[in-house]
A protein has these predicted regions:
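Acceptor/aglycone-binding surface of glycosyltransferases and processive sugar-polymer synthases
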Residues: 99-107, 111, 133-212
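N-proximal low-complexity "stem/linker" segments adjacent to membrane-targeting elements
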Residues: 1-57
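Conserved catalytic loops of nucleotide-sugar-dependent glycosyltransferases that act on lipid-linked
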Residues: 173-273
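The conserved acidic donor/metal-binding loop of glycosyltransferases
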Residues: 127-133
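Short aromatic/hydrophobic "clamp" motif used to bind/position activated sugar donors
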Residues: 123
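Conserved donor nucleotide-binding strand/loop of the catalytic core
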Residues: 67, 81-109
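Terminal low-complexity segments of carbohydrate-biosynthetic enzymes
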Residues: 1-9, 254-334
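A conserved acidic beta->alpha catalytic loop
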Residues: 73-81
Length: 334
Protein backbone atom coordinates (compact mmCIF):
# COMPACT_ATOMS: atom_id res chain seq x y z
CA UNK A 1 0.00 0.00 0.00
CA UNK A 2 1.37 3.43 -0.90
CA UNK A 3 2.39 5.81 1.87
CA UNK A 4 -0.37 8.30 1.10
CA UNK A 5 -3.06 5.65 1.55
CA UNK A 6 -1.55 4.43 4.83
CA UNK A 7 -1.36 7.97 6.18
CA UNK A 8 -4.99 8.59 5.23
CA UNK A 9 -6.07 5.40 6.99
CA UNK A 10 -4.32 6.47 10.19
CA UNK A 11 -5.72 10.01 10.11
CA UNK A 12 -9.24 9.48 8.77
CA UNK A 13 -10.38 6.21 10.32
CA UNK A 14 -12.46 6.28 13.50
CA UNK A 15 -14.87 3.97 15.30
CA UNK A 16 -18.57 4.51 15.84
CA UNK A 17 -17.89 4.57 19.58
CA UNK A 18 -15.85 7.75 19.07
CA UNK A 19 -19.06 9.62 18.26
CA UNK A 20 -21.49 9.60 21.22
CA UNK A 21 -24.86 11.12 20.42
CA UNK A 22 -24.50 13.79 23.11
CA UNK A 23 -21.40 15.19 21.42
CA UNK A 24 -23.09 15.08 18.03
CA UNK A 25 -26.15 16.98 19.27
CA UNK A 26 -23.93 19.84 20.44
CA UNK A 27 -22.15 20.00 17.10
CA UNK A 28 -25.37 19.70 15.13
CA UNK A 29 -26.91 22.61 17.03
CA UNK A 30 -23.83 24.80 16.65
CA UNK A 31 -23.88 24.25 12.89
CA UNK A 32 -27.67 24.47 12.48
CA UNK A 33 -27.41 21.23 10.53
CA UNK A 34 -30.33 19.10 9.39
CA UNK A 35 -29.88 15.33 9.09
CA UNK A 36 -31.85 12.94 6.88
CA UNK A 37 -31.60 9.15 6.92
CA UNK A 38 -32.50 7.64 3.56
CA UNK A 39 -33.12 3.94 2.92
CA UNK A 40 -33.39 2.84 -0.72
CA UNK A 41 -35.41 -0.37 -0.65
CA UNK A 42 -36.89 -2.99 -2.92
CA UNK A 43 -38.79 -6.01 -1.59
CA UNK A 44 -37.48 -5.65 1.98
CA UNK A 45 -40.73 -6.18 3.92
CA UNK A 46 -39.02 -8.71 6.20
CA UNK A 47 -36.40 -6.27 7.50
CA UNK A 48 -37.48 -2.69 6.81
CA UNK A 49 -39.87 -2.42 9.76
CA UNK A 50 -37.24 -3.18 12.40
CA UNK A 51 -34.76 -0.78 10.79
CA UNK A 52 -37.28 2.07 10.74
CA UNK A 53 -38.42 1.41 14.32
CA UNK A 54 -34.90 1.48 15.71
CA UNK A 55 -33.92 4.71 13.98
CA UNK A 56 -37.13 6.41 15.05
CA UNK A 57 -36.83 5.25 18.65
CA UNK A 58 -33.12 5.95 19.15
CA UNK A 59 -32.40 8.94 16.94
CA UNK A 60 -35.66 10.80 16.35
CA UNK A 61 -37.93 10.27 19.35
CA UNK A 62 -35.26 9.86 22.05
CA UNK A 63 -32.59 12.32 20.94
CA UNK A 64 -33.71 14.38 17.94
CA UNK A 65 -30.38 13.86 16.19
CA UNK A 66 -32.14 12.75 13.01
CA UNK A 67 -34.70 15.14 11.55
CA UNK A 68 -36.35 12.86 9.01
CA UNK A 69 -36.35 9.24 7.93
CA UNK A 70 -37.21 8.41 4.34
CA UNK A 71 -37.69 5.09 2.58
CA UNK A 72 -37.45 5.36 -1.20
CA UNK A 73 -39.28 2.34 -2.57
CA UNK A 74 -37.90 1.06 -5.87
CA UNK A 75 -40.71 -0.91 -7.53
CA UNK A 76 -41.31 -3.32 -4.67
CA UNK A 77 -43.79 -6.11 -5.32
CA UNK A 78 -44.22 -6.87 -1.62
CA UNK A 79 -45.38 -4.76 1.34
CA UNK A 80 -42.13 -2.83 1.84
CA UNK A 81 -43.81 0.57 1.51
CA UNK A 82 -46.71 -0.27 3.81
CA UNK A 83 -44.46 -1.76 6.51
CA UNK A 84 -42.08 1.20 6.40
CA UNK A 85 -44.91 3.73 6.61
CA UNK A 86 -46.64 1.87 9.43
CA UNK A 87 -43.43 1.96 11.48
CA UNK A 88 -42.93 5.70 11.09
CA UNK A 89 -40.96 6.40 7.91
CA UNK A 90 -41.79 8.93 5.26
CA UNK A 91 -42.25 6.71 2.20
CA UNK A 92 -41.91 7.67 -1.44
CA UNK A 93 -42.14 5.55 -4.57
CA UNK A 94 -39.07 6.43 -6.62
CA UNK A 95 -41.12 6.54 -9.82
CA UNK A 96 -43.48 9.13 -8.30
CA UNK A 97 -40.71 11.61 -7.52
CA UNK A 98 -40.28 14.14 -10.31
CA UNK A 99 -42.01 11.89 -12.88
CA UNK A 100 -41.19 14.38 -15.64
CA UNK A 101 -37.62 13.02 -15.51
CA UNK A 102 -38.80 9.47 -16.17
CA UNK A 103 -37.84 6.45 -14.11
CA UNK A 104 -35.19 3.75 -14.10
CA UNK A 105 -35.04 0.68 -11.91
CA UNK A 106 -32.14 0.56 -9.48
CA UNK A 107 -30.59 1.62 -6.20
CA UNK A 108 -28.81 4.61 -7.69
CA UNK A 109 -32.06 5.84 -9.18
CA UNK A 110 -33.69 5.75 -5.73
CA UNK A 111 -30.78 7.74 -4.27
CA UNK A 112 -30.91 10.31 -7.09
CA UNK A 113 -34.66 10.75 -6.69
CA UNK A 114 -34.25 11.10 -2.91
CA UNK A 115 -32.42 14.39 -3.46
CA UNK A 116 -35.70 15.94 -4.62
CA UNK A 117 -37.58 15.06 -1.41
CA UNK A 118 -35.01 14.80 1.41
CA UNK A 119 -34.35 18.08 3.18
CA UNK A 120 -31.17 17.36 5.15
CA UNK A 121 -27.84 19.12 4.79
CA UNK A 122 -26.27 15.79 5.77
CA UNK A 123 -27.61 12.58 4.25
CA UNK A 124 -27.04 9.11 5.68
CA UNK A 125 -27.79 6.11 3.47
CA UNK A 126 -28.49 2.64 4.85
CA UNK A 127 -29.37 -0.59 3.07
CA UNK A 128 -32.86 -1.96 3.68
CA UNK A 129 -31.85 -5.59 4.26
CA UNK A 130 -29.86 -5.20 7.49
CA UNK A 131 -30.43 -7.89 10.11
CA UNK A 132 -27.55 -7.29 12.53
CA UNK A 133 -26.70 -3.64 13.02
CA UNK A 134 -27.38 -0.74 15.40
CA UNK A 135 -28.32 2.93 15.44
CA UNK A 136 -24.61 3.61 15.99
CA UNK A 137 -24.32 3.08 12.24
CA UNK A 138 -25.98 6.47 11.82
CA UNK A 139 -24.14 8.30 14.59
CA UNK A 140 -20.81 6.94 13.37
CA UNK A 141 -21.41 8.11 9.81
CA UNK A 142 -22.61 11.54 10.93
CA UNK A 143 -19.72 12.16 13.32
CA UNK A 144 -16.92 13.13 10.92
CA UNK A 145 -19.28 15.31 8.87
CA UNK A 146 -20.30 17.32 11.94
CA UNK A 147 -16.75 17.62 13.27
CA UNK A 148 -14.69 18.50 10.19
CA UNK A 149 -15.90 20.72 7.37
CA UNK A 150 -13.27 19.29 5.04
CA UNK A 151 -14.91 15.88 5.12
CA UNK A 152 -17.44 15.39 2.32
CA UNK A 153 -18.03 11.63 2.28
CA UNK A 154 -17.90 9.05 5.08
CA UNK A 155 -17.79 5.34 4.31
CA UNK A 156 -18.81 2.74 6.86
CA UNK A 157 -16.93 -0.53 7.29
CA UNK A 158 -17.63 -3.56 9.41
CA UNK A 159 -16.95 -7.22 10.03
CA UNK A 160 -19.19 -9.53 8.04
CA UNK A 161 -20.59 -12.85 9.26
CA UNK A 162 -19.27 -15.93 7.45
CA UNK A 163 -19.88 -19.62 7.99
CA UNK A 164 -17.10 -21.36 9.87
CA UNK A 165 -15.06 -24.28 8.56
CA UNK A 166 -17.68 -26.77 9.75
CA UNK A 167 -20.36 -24.93 7.79
CA UNK A 168 -22.55 -23.86 10.68
CA UNK A 169 -20.55 -21.79 13.17
CA UNK A 170 -20.74 -18.12 12.30
CA UNK A 171 -17.67 -15.98 12.69
CA UNK A 172 -16.99 -12.33 11.96
CA UNK A 173 -14.19 -11.32 9.63
CA UNK A 174 -13.10 -7.86 8.50
CA UNK A 175 -13.69 -8.62 4.83
CA UNK A 176 -15.84 -7.12 2.14
CA UNK A 177 -18.38 -9.06 0.16
CA UNK A 178 -17.55 -11.09 -2.91
CA UNK A 179 -17.91 -8.19 -5.33
CA UNK A 180 -15.77 -5.98 -3.08
CA UNK A 181 -12.92 -8.47 -2.80
CA UNK A 182 -13.00 -9.76 -6.39
CA UNK A 183 -13.84 -6.57 -8.31
CA UNK A 184 -13.86 -3.26 -6.43
CA UNK A 185 -10.73 -3.66 -4.29
CA UNK A 186 -8.51 -4.95 -7.11
CA UNK A 187 -9.67 -2.08 -9.33
CA UNK A 188 -8.85 0.51 -6.68
CA UNK A 189 -5.42 -0.97 -5.94
CA UNK A 190 -4.53 -1.14 -9.62
CA UNK A 191 -5.91 2.17 -10.87
CA UNK A 192 -6.63 4.36 -7.82
CA UNK A 193 -3.97 3.31 -5.26
CA UNK A 194 -4.66 6.32 -3.02
CA UNK A 195 -8.03 4.69 -2.29
CA UNK A 196 -6.59 1.29 -1.41
CA UNK A 197 -7.17 1.85 2.33
CA UNK A 198 -10.93 2.31 1.97
CA UNK A 199 -12.08 -0.87 3.70
CA UNK A 200 -15.60 -1.12 2.25
CA UNK A 201 -15.54 0.94 -0.97
CA UNK A 202 -18.97 -0.21 -2.20
CA UNK A 203 -20.69 -0.73 1.16
CA UNK A 204 -24.26 0.54 1.41
CA UNK A 205 -23.80 2.50 4.64
CA UNK A 206 -22.39 5.98 4.04
CA UNK A 207 -22.87 9.63 4.92
CA UNK A 208 -22.45 12.58 2.59
CA UNK A 209 -22.93 16.31 2.39
CA UNK A 210 -25.95 17.17 0.32
CA UNK A 211 -24.13 19.78 -1.75
CA UNK A 212 -21.57 17.19 -2.82
CA UNK A 213 -24.10 14.56 -3.86
CA UNK A 214 -26.16 17.10 -5.78
CA UNK A 215 -23.07 17.96 -7.83
CA UNK A 216 -22.30 14.39 -8.96
CA UNK A 217 -23.69 12.23 -11.73
CA UNK A 218 -25.35 9.14 -10.25
CA UNK A 219 -25.39 5.68 -11.88
CA UNK A 220 -28.92 4.30 -11.71
CA UNK A 221 -27.90 0.89 -10.40
CA UNK A 222 -25.29 -0.70 -8.16
CA UNK A 223 -22.45 1.39 -9.56
CA UNK A 224 -23.65 4.16 -7.22
CA UNK A 225 -21.18 3.75 -4.35
CA UNK A 226 -18.14 3.24 -6.57
CA UNK A 227 -19.00 6.33 -8.61
CA UNK A 228 -19.54 8.54 -5.56
CA UNK A 229 -16.24 7.41 -4.05
CA UNK A 230 -14.22 7.94 -7.22
CA UNK A 231 -15.83 11.26 -8.10
CA UNK A 232 -15.44 12.67 -4.60
CA UNK A 233 -11.76 11.75 -4.64
CA UNK A 234 -11.34 13.19 -8.13
CA UNK A 235 -12.97 16.53 -7.31
CA UNK A 236 -11.95 17.05 -3.68
CA UNK A 237 -8.99 14.80 -2.97
CA UNK A 238 -8.28 12.13 -0.39
CA UNK A 239 -8.76 14.41 2.62
CA UNK A 240 -12.44 14.83 1.70
CA UNK A 241 -12.95 11.16 2.62
CA UNK A 242 -13.26 9.49 6.00
CA UNK A 243 -14.32 6.06 7.19
CA UNK A 244 -15.85 4.67 10.36
CA UNK A 245 -15.69 1.19 11.89
CA UNK A 246 -19.31 0.20 12.54
CA UNK A 247 -18.63 -3.16 14.18
CA UNK A 248 -20.57 -6.17 12.87
CA UNK A 249 -23.06 -6.14 10.02
CA UNK A 250 -25.26 -8.91 8.73
CA UNK A 251 -27.64 -8.75 5.81
CA UNK A 252 -29.40 -10.83 3.16
CA UNK A 253 -27.08 -12.30 0.54
CA UNK A 254 -27.65 -12.30 -3.20
CA UNK A 255 -27.07 -15.12 -5.68
CA UNK A 256 -23.81 -15.31 -7.60
CA UNK A 257 -25.65 -14.55 -10.86
CA UNK A 258 -27.13 -11.38 -9.33
CA UNK A 259 -23.70 -10.42 -8.06
CA UNK A 260 -22.37 -10.87 -11.59
CA UNK A 261 -24.64 -8.09 -12.81
CA UNK A 262 -23.53 -5.91 -9.89
CA UNK A 263 -19.89 -6.57 -10.75
CA UNK A 264 -20.49 -5.59 -14.37
CA UNK A 265 -22.11 -2.31 -13.27
CA UNK A 266 -19.17 -1.46 -11.03
CA UNK A 267 -16.64 -2.25 -13.75
CA UNK A 268 -18.55 -0.05 -16.20
CA UNK A 269 -18.44 2.85 -13.72
CA UNK A 270 -14.69 2.37 -13.30
CA UNK A 271 -14.06 2.15 -17.05
CA UNK A 272 -16.01 5.35 -17.65
CA UNK A 273 -13.87 7.17 -15.12
CA UNK A 274 -10.79 5.83 -16.88
CA UNK A 275 -12.16 7.57 -19.99
CA UNK A 276 -13.27 4.44 -21.82
CA UNK A 277 -16.13 4.74 -24.27
CA UNK A 278 -19.47 4.25 -22.49
CA UNK A 279 -21.57 1.22 -23.35
CA UNK A 280 -24.90 2.38 -24.75
CA UNK A 281 -26.46 -0.99 -23.94
CA UNK A 282 -24.82 -3.67 -21.85
CA UNK A 283 -25.79 -7.31 -21.50
CA UNK A 284 -24.20 -9.96 -19.30
CA UNK A 285 -24.58 -13.48 -20.69
CA UNK A 286 -24.65 -16.09 -17.92
CA UNK A 287 -24.75 -19.88 -18.31
CA UNK A 288 -27.61 -21.71 -16.58
CA UNK A 289 -28.42 -25.38 -17.24
CA UNK A 290 -31.96 -24.86 -15.96
CA UNK A 291 -33.00 -22.75 -18.95
CA UNK A 292 -33.48 -23.81 -22.54
CA UNK A 293 -30.33 -23.24 -24.55
CA UNK A 294 -28.26 -22.77 -21.41
CA UNK A 295 -27.71 -19.01 -21.67
CA UNK A 296 -29.48 -16.12 -19.94
CA UNK A 297 -28.95 -12.55 -21.15
CA UNK A 298 -29.09 -10.18 -18.17
CA UNK A 299 -29.34 -6.44 -18.87
CA UNK A 300 -26.74 -4.34 -17.06
CA UNK A 301 -27.95 -0.84 -16.08
CA UNK A 302 -25.28 1.56 -17.31
CA UNK A 303 -27.21 4.84 -17.42
CA UNK A 304 -26.16 7.72 -15.17
CA UNK A 305 -28.39 10.50 -13.93
CA UNK A 306 -26.94 14.01 -14.32
CA UNK A 307 -26.11 16.12 -11.27
CA UNK A 308 -29.31 17.29 -9.60
CA UNK A 309 -28.05 20.87 -9.68
CA UNK A 310 -27.93 20.72 -13.47
CA UNK A 311 -31.45 19.50 -14.19
CA UNK A 312 -33.31 22.62 -13.17
CA UNK A 313 -32.26 26.02 -11.86
CA UNK A 314 -35.73 26.41 -10.46
CA UNK A 315 -35.37 23.19 -8.48
CA UNK A 316 -32.39 24.53 -6.54
CA UNK A 317 -34.36 27.52 -5.32
CA UNK A 318 -37.41 25.41 -4.45
CA UNK A 319 -35.23 22.96 -2.54
CA UNK A 320 -33.66 25.73 -0.46
CA UNK A 321 -37.10 27.10 0.39
CA UNK A 322 -38.42 23.63 1.24
CA UNK A 323 -35.53 22.93 3.61
CA UNK A 324 -36.00 26.28 5.33
CA UNK A 325 -39.70 25.62 5.87
CA UNK A 326 -39.48 21.92 6.71
CA UNK A 327 -40.64 20.82 10.17
CA UNK A 328 -38.02 19.33 12.41
CA UNK A 329 -39.54 15.83 12.34
CA UNK A 330 -41.78 14.28 9.73
CA UNK A 331 -43.84 11.31 10.74
CA UNK A 332 -45.82 10.57 7.59
CA UNK A 333 -45.43 10.70 3.88
CA UNK A 334 -46.42 9.20 0.62
Amino acid sequence: MITRARAWFAARTTAATDWPVEKLLIRKTSRSARISVVIPARNEEATIGAIVRRIRADLIDATGLVDELLVIDSDSTDATAQVARRNGAQVWAAADIRPEFGAYHGKGEAVWKSLFVATGDILVFLDGDLTEWGSHFVTGLVGPLLSDERVQLVKGFYDRQFAGDNGDAAEARPQGGRVTELVARPLLNLKWPELAAVVQPIGGEWGVRRELLESLSIPVGYGLEMAVLLDTWQHYGLDALAQVDLGIRRHRHQSVHDLGVMAAEIQHVALLRLHADPAAHAVLNQFDRAVEGGWVARPVPVQERPPVTSVSERYAERARIARARAPRIRTSGR
